[in-house]
Amino acid sequence: TLLGDGLDGAESVATLYRLAIAATAAYSDGLLSGATDLTARHVSERHQFGKPLATFQAVAQQIADVYVTARTLHVAALSSVWRVSRGLDADDDLDVTAYWIAAELPPAMRVLHHLHGGIGVDATYPLHRYSSTAKDLARWLGGASYRLDLVGARCSSI
């Protein structure tokens, strides 16, 4: 069988679902990391009022907020993928990670766009691909409200 011996149809679908969410988590982690690196380079090289943008307090604060989102996503993705890879119960981790992706990844990308100014929305600029992929992933996961409902249902059934 595709997903292992001894699995019935429902178990196979559940396993495939867990693998898909884990893969999305890992992909989202790399996506935000790449977009953050691109933005960090941009604000270090772009000058305004004779100084790099990165030296302005408001820019540093916004990058710091995105960094917190990125680190949280990284830890959540790592935990989810590790639990799935070990065959452990990963459903809680996967639900929380999927919620974090749907709720926090698109706003983080908006901040990174803001820090790029007008260049970030140019379809030929790399940030555009990062951002459009982030939006697609959030939609693929069902959006933040749907994911929060799943997390809430899981918590209320404890």
What are these model-predicted stretches?
Residues T1-L19:
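A short, charged helix-loop
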Residues R18-I158:
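Alpha-helical interface subdomain recognition
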